[in-house]
Amino acid sequence: MALLHKEKLIECIDNELQNSGTLLLLTKNIVVSEISYNGNDYKYFTFNENHDLIGQENLKGATSNNIAKMVYNWIAKNPQTNKVWVGEPRIRIYFKNNLYHTNNNHVCIKDFYKVSISVSPNIFNDRSIWCTKCTSFYPFSSILSPNLFQ
């Protein structure tokens, strides 16, 4: 069962990247990494806490699926008890376009939360997803009811 949920979560990230989405990883509300599609390849950017660019890399030959698996594995291997970069290990995942919104029902948020807690109940305790339609962060831990956004 967990494998199906893991695959669903990877598919969610993969679909976003395939549709020219941008994936941002944030720590304490600060963007520290970005993965974007730039025509032929994906680019990986890293930033410091002032949002100064400190590194960039062309991910030549990478597919949206490889990247999705890498992101999933990175999240899974950094539980909340570990330090991620510097400071409080709060990870947010940002989907730039509206791919997962259906009738303003926040499908992206509900699916991502449901899948995440099915993989590991405590993995996303302090993690959240950016909703582009209502432009705010929703903590996974407060999305307890499937009816919350209906």
From Swiss-Prot:
Cofactor mode of binding and number, as noted: Binds 1 Zn(2+) ion.
UniProt source species: African swine fever virus (isolate Pig/Kenya/KEN-50/1950)
Protein name: Protein A151R
Keyword Metal-binding: yes
A GO MF label: metal ion binding
Domain of life of the organism encoding this protein: Viruses
Family under the similarity heading: Belongs to the asfivirus A151R family.
Coiled coil regions, renumbered to chain: none
Assembly mode: Monomer. Homodimer. Interacts with protein B119L. Interacts with membrane protein E248R.
Cofactor requirement: Zn(2+)
Induction pattern: Expressed in the early phase of the viral replicative cycle.
Keywords: Early protein, Metal-binding
Taxonomic classification: Viruses, Varidnaviria, Bamfordvirae, Nucleocytoviricota, Pokkesviricetes
Job description of the protein: May participate in a redox cascade for the formation of disulfide bonds in viral proteins.
